[in-house]
Design a protein with these regions (language model features):
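Short, small/polar-rich loop/turn modules that mediate ligand/substrate recognition or access, typified
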Residues: 23, 28, 74, 116, ...
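Catalytic Tyr-X3-Lys loop
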Residues: 25, 33, 40-60, 78, ...
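Conserved NAD(P)H cofactor-binding loop of Rossmann-fold oxidoreductase domains
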Residues: 30-36, 186-187
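Substrate-binding pocket helix/loop in short-chain dehydrogenase/reductase
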Residues: 38-39, 46-51, 135-136, 143-147
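Amphipathic alpha-helical dimer-interface segment in Rossmann-like NAD(P)H-dependent oxidoreductases
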Residues: 53-73, 85, 112-113, 117, ...
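C-terminal substrate-recognition "lid" of short-chain dehydrogenase/reductases
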Residues: 59, 155-184, 189
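Catalytic loop of short-chain dehydrogenase/reductase
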Residues: 70, 76-103, 108-117, 129
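A glycine/serine/threonine-rich, flexible loop-to-helix segment
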Residues: 91-93, 117, 124-151, 161
Length: 190
């Protein structure tokens, strides 16, 4: 365990998985955090942290995992992005996160192009508003209601909605899908 933004942590993690399980068939890169800063307030440190935690961690994980995935009969990589890479809102400023997730999606496409010859699929899912462990409460009920209202389907995604898409992309049914960013956002990015 450790912070994937730190040098060497991704390699240690992939190596530990390979040692424990004798290989690696699938990788889901879900590292990230939401730095609440507008573009006007954006600091170099916040931007660097976001890039280290998201596209940097993905690059380190996928790069280290590649030889193991090449030995698999059904190698898959799925990265978790976010709708913020596609829809910026002034009332919910996440400039560093938006930029980092957009860079992550670009790396997904780059890796897909480079890894395809070895049969490795590389895709991303981009969730919209998704309920977390701390669902609506008296302190945040208005924010959840606003998020539901902003989502064309009128509901917030559950973690299982996102997990189902990831599971599909890891399955044999998705063996012809690579280099894609698939939104699971209730129409938020329409």
């Amino acid at each position: 365990t450790g912070d994937l933004a730190e040098p060497g942590v991704a390699a240690t993690l992939v190596d530990a998985v390979a040692t424990r399980f004798g290989g690696l068939d699938q990788l889901v890169a879900n590292a990230g955090f939401a730095a609440r800063q507008s573009f006007s307030e954006l600091s170099a440190d916040a931007l660097a942290s976001a890039f280290a935690a998201m596209p940097g961690a993905f690059s380190a994980l996928a790069g280290r995992a590649r030889p193991l995935l090449e030995a698999s009969i059904a190698p898959r990589i799925v990265a978790v992005s976010s709708f913020v890479a596609h829809r910026y809102r002034a009332d919910a400023p996440f400039a560093a996160t938006a930029a980092a997730k957009a860079a992550l999606e670009s790396l997904v496409r780059t890796a897909a192009a480079e890894f395809a010859a070895r049969g490795i699929t590389v895709n991303a899912v981009a969730p919209g508003f998704t309920r977390k462990d701390h669902g609506p409460s008296a302190g945040n009920a208005a924010a959840w209601a606003q998020a539901e209202q902003a989502t064309p389907l009128g509901r917030i995604a559950e973690p299982d909605d996102v997990a189902a898409l990831i599971a599909f992309l890891l399955s044999d049914a998705a063996r012809q899908i690579t280099g894609q960013v698939i939104h699971v956002d209730g129409g938020l990015t329409l």
